[in-house]
Amino acid sequence: MYLTKEIKEEIFAKHGEKTNTGKAEAQIALFTFRISHLTEHLKKNRHDYNTERSLVLLVGKRRSLLDYLKKKEINRYREIIKELGIRK
């Protein structure tokens, strides 16, 4: 499995708190990790349409979290965009 417990803990520790995994930044960082992994998979497997669909759904979930963060805390939004290298 590409997303081990250690990787999750590392992401949560870096982008939030180790115990607060529901923080918007932590969830966005986790979605970004999964999106990058699925993107690499789709480069090798062009006809994997189920993975392509799940990638689109993940991008939508991340976008909605980013919109929420932008509406509530613009400074935290700008930090996470810059830190993860996400386009606006």
UniProtKB/Swiss-Prot annotation:
GO terms for molecular function: rRNA binding; structural constituent of ribosome. Signal peptide: none annotated. Keywords: Ribonucleoprotein, Ribosomal protein, RNA-binding, rRNA-binding. GO terms for biological process: translation. One of the primary rRNA binding proteins, it binds directly to 16S rRNA where it helps nucleate assembly of the platform of the 30S subunit by binding and bridging several RNA helices of the 16S rRNA. Forms an intersubunit bridge (bridge B4) with the 23S rRNA of the 50S subunit in the ribosome. HAMAP family: Ribosomal_uS15_B (MF_01343_B). Belongs to the universal ribosomal protein uS15 family. PANTHER family: RIBOSOMAL PROTEIN S15, BACTERIAL AND ORGANELLAR (PTHR23321), SMALL RIBOSOMAL SUBUNIT PROTEIN US15M (PTHR23321:SF26). This is Small ribosomal subunit protein uS15. The gene is rpsO.
